[in-house]
Design a protein with these regions (language model features):
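Walker A/P-loop-proximal flanking segment of P-loop NTPase domains
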Residues: 1-77, 81-83
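Extended alpha-helical interface modules used as scaffolds for assembling large macromolecular complexes
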Residues: 1-13, 310-311, 315-323, 352, ...
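C-terminal leucine-rich, beta-strand-based interaction scaffolds used for sensing/assembly
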Residues: 2, 363-451
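P-loop NTPase nucleotide-binding core
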Residues: 54-55, 60-219
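A short acidic (Asp/Glu
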Residues: 69-71, 96-99, 233-239, 273-279, ...
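The catalytic "switch" region of P-loop NTPases
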Residues: 192, 204-328
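Amphipathic alpha-helical "lid/sensor" segments that cap RecA-like P-loop NTPase cores
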Residues: 327-379
Length: 451
């Protein structure tokens, strides 16, 4: 795909939420400017070298490029003979209200649907799971009604493609009800919560049968990759207990009980405090995808990082003909204003196109770039509580964060970004946050006190 030469083309190719397919020409390898950790190769080797099933976590700020890297991992695993089930969890479930039983249901749905579409016969395991759901999830008389409704939908071609096993329709209905219905969601969760061992056993029966069938076809094993779990909303449930802890720590054992290789994305905020230590005891490995280093730590003299800035320019130029559409000053402004965050970089480019001046030979002007940045600054201003600014200034001055709930929340909201310098991570305040009036006032206040 050649770089876009019109504003319309540029607007669409700069879509900040679209992960790139593995062989997309727009892909820019940023491994060396993220800290020299090749996360895709590490996750691949963990799976391909291990005789036992592995359960790994993958994290990084939302929008840093995790989905693109996971799609590359999927391609590499499939090329090595693995059967990969990849899906984004928010396509099935609501990240604002998601618990581990919901996730297990979603994995079951995806495994059943994909194996059926690929003509991998799971045989009697499907019937056993279907019978179990009929007995456990539905009350007497409910199942017959649901069964008839789903059969009618299948006959007239509603919903899933024809030919999928009946249990695929059952699981699709259940995940859909959990995503959209409050009362029925509570009922389903209550009934499943009392039967977790049986739910996992049934899912493992499906995975065991899938393993047998894919190996019979000459492949190695099943691997499940669950993307976008890092979008699960952070909720303080009291007593230092959060929604993230509930999913990945308190019930992490259940997520690791599946008889297949698994990779789950996880919020980057969980890499600090007690959460990190607890995760290390549950999952085999947690891989971090840091920001692109657009600058050096302030504690080491600061200044731009030439390699990182070059790579950010490459990301823009692979997508759009910047020489034809952008003022050079605008391109530089985008790269500095994003803080090395790929999605924010694309967001700034796309929003600046909305402010482009058609009268100019290069319509994406520096003025348009500044207006786009103003929208990002405004978004942060509505998000950050006033008590956080003193702590944000401390992060700005030290390039370090504390391992407490407030700093975890800053990482989750991306008001603080994580970078890597070899094996040692460092942190900085997002450039847009640095321009907020409240931040500048607190920074000036701290300098007066120090002076």
């Amino acid at each position: 795909m050649p770089p876009a030469k019109t504003l319309r083309e540029a607007y669409n190719t700069a879509n900040p939420t679209e992960p790139l397919p593995p062989d997309d020409e727009r892909y820019v390898n940023c491994t060396d400017v993220r800290g020299d950790e090749d996360t895709v190769s590490q996750m691949f080797r963990t799976i391909s070298y291990s005789d036992a099933h592995t359960h790994q976590l993958f994290t990084g700020h939302r929008g840093c490029g995790k989905s693109t890297e996971l799609l590359r991992l999927q391609q590499r695993l499939e090329g090595d003979g693995f059967y990969v089930v990849y899906f984004a969890v928010d396509e099935d479930l609501d990240p604002n209200d998601l618990i581990y039983t919901d996730l297990l249901l979603s994995i079951a749905r995806r495994v059943v649907a994909q194996t059926s579409e690929d003509e991998i016969n799971l045989g009697d395991a499907l019937n056993v799971v279907e019978k179990w759901f009929a007995e456990v999830v539905y009350e007497e008389g409910e199942w017959e009604k649901v069964e008839q409704e789903l059969k009618n939908e299948a006959e007239i071609g509603l919903g899933l493609p024809k030919g999928l096993p009946f249990i695929a329709r059952v699981l699709t209905r259940l995940t859909g009800q959990i995503k959209t219905g409050d009362e029925v969601k509570k009922k389903i969760r209550q009934r499943l919560d009392n039967r977790i061992p049986q739910l996992i056993s049934g899912l493992n029966d499906l995975l065991n049968r899938a393993d047998v069938e894919v190996q019979r076809a000459g492949r190695k094993a099943v691997a499940v990759i669950v993307d976008n779990l890092d979008r699960v909303t952070y909720k303080d449930l009291g007593d230092g207990h959060t929604s993230h802890d509930a999913l990945f720590i308190e019930n992490g054992g259940q997520l690791c009980a599946l008889r297949c290789h698994t990779i789950y994305t996880v919020p980057i905020s969980m890499m600090y405090g007690l959460s990190a230590r607890n995760l290390d005891g549950i999952f085999a490995r947690c891989h971090v995808l840091p920001m692109i280093k657009s600058h050096r730590p302030r504690t080491q003299g600061g200044g731009e990082e030439p390699g990182g800035m070059d790579r950010l320019r490459d990301i823009i130029r692979r997508r759009i003909d910047a020489d034809a559409l952008c003022e050079p000053e605008a391109v530089e402004y985008f790269c500095r204003a994003c803080g090395g965050h790929p999605r924010d970089l694309m967001t700034l480019v796309r929003q600046s196109i909305e402010y482009a001046d058609d009268k100019e030979p290069r319509p994406v002007t520096l003025a348009a770039a500044r207006r786009a940045e103003a929208r990002l600054i405004s978004a942060f201003s509505r998000m950050i509580p006033e008590p956080y600014y003193e702590k944000l200034v401390a992060v700005y001055q030290t390039n370090k964060i504390k391992k407490d709930a407030d700093h975890q929340a800053m990482l989750f909201s991306q008001s603080v970004l994580e970078y890597a310098n070899g094996t040692e991570p460092w942190h900085d305040v997002h450039p847009a946050v640095q321009k907020l009036k409240s931040f500048q006032e607190e920074l000036n206040r701290s300098r007066v006190i120090e002076g």
